[in-house]
UniProtKB/Swiss-Prot annotation:
Coiled-coil zones: 39-101
Subcellular locations according to the entry: Nucleus, Nucleolus
The UniProt record lists the keyword Transmembrane: no
Cleaved signal peptide residues: none
Disulphide-bridged cysteine pairs: none
Compositionally biased tracts (Basic residues): 94-114
Residue spans of biased composition, Basic and acidic residues class: 39-93
InterPro entries, per database record: Cgr1-like
GO terms classed as biological process: rRNA processing
Primary location recorded for the protein, binned into one broad class: nucleus
Protein name per the record: rRNA-processing protein cgrA
Coiled coil recorded as keyword: yes
Cellular component, GO, one term: nucleolus
Length: 114
C-alpha cells in the first residue's frame, strides 16, 4: 500500500472566542453590496444620473422662461390698458387732435429714451 493521503488545506483556526460561545459561527462583516458592482457600471450609472439631472435642469429652465414670458405679457397688457385709460381721460378734457399730438410726442420721447 502506498500512503497517498490527500492533504486538504484546513481552515486556519482563529483561536477561542472571547465570550466562550465556541458553538456559534464566526461573524463576518455585513456588506451585501460590496464588490457586486464594477467600476465601469458605477461610472455608467453616474453618467446616467448626471444626464437625468441635466435634463431636469433644462426642463426647469424652460418652465421658468415660459413663466417669465407670461408675466411679461401680463405687465405689457396692463401698461397698455392704463395708457389707453389715461388717454381717454385726457380726451374728455381736451380736443381729440391735441390728444393725438400728445400721443405721438410721448411715443417719440419713449423711443429716444430707450
Amino acid at each position: 500500500m502506498s500512503s497517498t493521503v490527500s492533504a486538504t488545506p484546513a481552515d486556519p483556526t482563529k483561536g477561542m472566542r472571547k465570550n466562550g460561545k465556541n458553538w456559534h459561527d464566526n461573524k463576518k462583516p455585513f456588506r451585501p453590496n460590496a464588490g457586486l458592482t464594477s467600476y465601469e457600471k458605477r461610472l455608467e450609472a453616474r453618467k446616467h444620473q448626471e444626464a437625468v439631472k441635466e435634463h431636469e435642469r433644462e426642463l426647469k429652465e424652460e418652465k421658468e422662461a415660459e413663466r417669465k414670458a407670461h408675466i411679461q405679457r401680463i405687465k405689457e397688457r396692463r401698461a397698455a390698458k392704463e395708457e389707453k385709460e389715461r388717454y381717454e381721460k385726457m380726451a374728455e378734457k381736451m380736443h381729440r387732435k391735441r390728444v393725438e399730438r400728445l400721443k405721438r410726442k410721448e411715443k417719440r420721447n419713449k423711443l429716444l429714451n430707450s
